[in-house]
């Protein structure tokens, strides 16, 4: 099934998840000022599938039409098809709005591909059946999933099981014949206030206590599920798409997830009680890290194309595009675009063709994504450098051009090479919304830390990602050393 936007809006309105905002429970997230922007963008995502046939596929695993984001690639050609579909989606977002429904659709699809070689082997047939059933349910209903994985930072000097309350991090309080009761919290559940379903993933690297090792899927309106949303970064009152051209379309909400003695049925659980199996899930058999980092590269490729275009347009508009120092920075941005494009092509060409799925190359996907943690903030830095003070003296809003006397002054003094005043203001409003608005700053912070601390991730590339290949590289040095003469003693 492929829904239309109005069906999604009706669904989330009727489900009415418990969302706290500014001290109150939100009555209708579809109309609330803090959430109506992303709700409309998600609705457009669904409508986009009806406008562009290439985003729809016949899903042979379920036996009906679905979004291309549910495609389980079984060949390099199908992996390419998936990548091309996702690029089309993120090009429509200009690389923003990274927690679109397709993101978790891909996760759910990957889980289903490993129902036998991972979930059945590690947890038994029942859990493997749960994986398949949840995937089929997701395809047939075209649900919008959020996820939560980051545990509260209560005291990082001690494992959560030694905290004053061991259920600050989400854990199993007790089992019943029908399921388990879970309690605790998780941070930064992006899109949660307007999502229909939730995946919770365990964080067991900080504590291997089995009660924390649970991975499940439940509706966001399940009794005891609560979300505390951050302050919205929507346009200020009285302003809109002219003044905030990016955040008026691609503002994403983030929330804290609270599970207050929530009942999770056994048939919604796919991972339980074996913390040692998380390594196989993240790094070995399933290699979820490969998939979500590959998806990040797709998002960033679309964003960098947009940022490079923005920088070039600004440089040409103010007549600095022939300065060598500016050309160097523009060239740097274009190199970043090509690097991400090459990484996507390379990850396909060197893909791992497994029995039930073809996976993008892990080394390339993870390395490029980790590099982008520093590269994207650098792109913003280049935009700030190129624009200089030009991003500051911009009129307050569209109404300035509706005042005849003021309009004449603006048209005379704000025009620049190749752009009239209104075009120039539009251009620099885009720039400011990317580099200076609350939404823009949030995106930059998200780009830096959404995969974790960049220092740890870069170090991890050495001690974990390339663990199997380090000997391949050091062997080359040893070959040269062996060819060198030794002293005659």
Question: Where does each model-flagged region fall?
Answer:
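Generic structural signal for well-ordered, non-transmembrane alpha-helical segments
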Residues: 36, 40, 136-139, 181, ...
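N-terminal-proximal low-complexity accessory segments that begin disordered
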Residues: 1-48
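Short, charged, amphipathic alpha-helical segments
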Residues: 324-331, 359-367
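Alpha-helix capping/hinge segments and adjacent helical runs
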Residues: 363-489
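Glycine-rich flavin
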Residues: 61-196, 203-216, 221, 226
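FAD-binding core of flavoproteins
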Residues: 152-296, 463-488
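Extended amphipathic alpha-helical segments enriched in small hydrophobics
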Residues: 292-353
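Charged/polar positions within long, soluble alpha-helices
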Residues: 150, 316, 342-349, 377-384, ...
């Amino acid at each position: 099934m492929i829904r239309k936007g109005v069906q999604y809006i009706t669904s989330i309105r009727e489900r009415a998840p418990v969302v706290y905002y500014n001290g109150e429970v939100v009555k209708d997230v579809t109309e609330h000022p803090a959430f109506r922007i992303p709700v409309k963008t998600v609705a457009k995502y669904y409508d986009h599938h009806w406008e562009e046939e290439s985003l729809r596929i016949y899903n042979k695993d379920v036996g009906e039409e679905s979004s291309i984001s549910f495609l389980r690639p079984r060949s390099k050609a199908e992996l390419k098809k998936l990548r091309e579909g996702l690029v089309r989606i993120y090009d429509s977002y200009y690389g923003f709005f990274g927690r679109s429904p397709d993101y978790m659709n891909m996760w759910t699809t990957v889980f289903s591909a490993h129902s036998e070689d991972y979930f059945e082997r590690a947890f038994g047939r029942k859990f493997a059946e749960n994986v398949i059933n949840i995937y089929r349910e997701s395809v047939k209903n075209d649900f919008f999933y959020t996820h939560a994985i980051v545990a509260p930072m209560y005291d990082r000097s001690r494992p959560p099981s030694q905290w004053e309350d061991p259920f600050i991090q989400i854990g199993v309080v007790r089992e019943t014949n029908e399921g388990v009761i879970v309690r605790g919290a998780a941070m930064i559940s992006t899109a949660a206030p307007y999502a229909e379903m939730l995946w919770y993933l365990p964080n067991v690297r900080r504590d291997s206590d089995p009660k924390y090792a649970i991975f499940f899927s439940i509706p966001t309106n399940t009794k005891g599920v609560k979300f505390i949303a951050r302050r919205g970064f929507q346009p200020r009152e009285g302003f809109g798409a002219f003044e905030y051209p990016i955040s008026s379309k691609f503002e994403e909400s983030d929330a804290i997830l609270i599970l207050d003695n929530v009942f999770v049925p056994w048939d919604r659980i796919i991972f339980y009680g074996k913390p040692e199996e998380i390594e196989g899930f993240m790094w070995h058999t399933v290699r979820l890290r490969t998939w979500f980092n590959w998806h990040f590269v797709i998002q960033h490729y679309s964003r960098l194309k947009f940022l490079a275009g923005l920088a070039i347009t600004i440089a040409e508009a103010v007549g600095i595009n022939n300065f060598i120092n500016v050309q160097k920075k523009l060239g740097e941005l274009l190199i970043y675009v090509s690097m991400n494009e090459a990484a996507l092509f390379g990850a396909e060409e060197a893909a791992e063709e497994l029995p039930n799925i073809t996976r993008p190359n892990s080394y390339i996907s993870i390395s490029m994504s980790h590099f982008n943690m520093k590269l994207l903030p650098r792109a913003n830095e280049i935009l700030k450098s190129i624009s200089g003070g030009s991003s500051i003296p911009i009129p307050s809003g569209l109404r300035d051009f509706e005042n005849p006397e003021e309009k004449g002054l603006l048209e005379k003094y704000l025009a620049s090479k190749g752009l009239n005043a209104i075009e120039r203001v539009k251009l620099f409003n885009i720039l400011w919304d990317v580099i200076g608005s609350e939404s823009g700053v949030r995106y930059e912070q998200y780009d830096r830390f959404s995969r974790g601390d960049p220092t740890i991730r870069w170090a991890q590339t050495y001690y974990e990602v390339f663990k199997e290949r380090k000997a391949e590289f050091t062997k080359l040095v040893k070959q040269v050393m062996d060819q060198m003469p030794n002293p005659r003693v």
